[in-house]
């Protein structure tokens, strides 16, 4: 697999994005399912499997060699930890095969990574959330089919007002992406802004048993994110 990655690094660096076929090849090779439970299409490894995979990708293919794998594996851990069985059945197999590319959308233009201060909102509208706001510096943002989005479900609260909502982007009205952001390193990892204007997703896309758990969920997973 690495032999297929290396010859393309310069081209991907110039494009600021890897070819989509790479994700499918990574899925075929079993790389994307290292920590996904077997019943959902992976082979049931732990954090150690992901760490070794990241190490090998970086060692053999440089700073563009991970091509967003770290973010994909981070999102897997969120769905594993907080998703319902139905959510896991729906999303994990697609993440394992590379059919879906994932991103975690937390950072915002005006607040950085201060999650308590985010401005993006997800307001209930019947049986849906209506999402408005923007995110910046989002790895895999240009490719993402699935986004774990940090948003305020209660604008009057700080940390207790944050929830994580899964957004599937295909043909999604009101959702748009900015141009790839140029970086000093990790040039093959596409990074961009994301915009949400009255975007609607089902209430069942909430991660966790109730609203307001997002800040805790993010802090709980932060050690793995930093390792990745």
Predicted features and spans:
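Short Ser/Thr-interspersed hydrophobic loop/turn segments at strand-loop and sheet-helix junctions
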Residues: 30, 53-58, 150-151, 167-172, ...
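Short Gly/Pro-enriched turn/cap motifs at secondary-structure boundaries
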Residues: 68, 95, 110-113, 137-140, ...
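A gly/ser-rich beta-alpha-beta helix-loop segment of oxidoreductase catalytic cores
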Residues: 101-123
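Amphipathic, small/basic residue-rich leader segments at the start of a protein or domain
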Residues: 1-70, 81, 86-90, 94-97, ...
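Structural signature of FAD isoalloxazine-binding scaffolds in flavoprotein oxidoreductases
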Residues: 44-56, 114-118, 195, 201
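Glycine-rich beta->alpha junctions and the first turn(s) of the following alpha-helix
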Residues: 164, 175-228
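A short core secondary-structure module
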Residues: 132-176
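Short glycine/proline-enriched turns and hinge-like loops at secondary-structure junctions
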Residues: 45-46, 114-116, 140-144, 158-161, ...
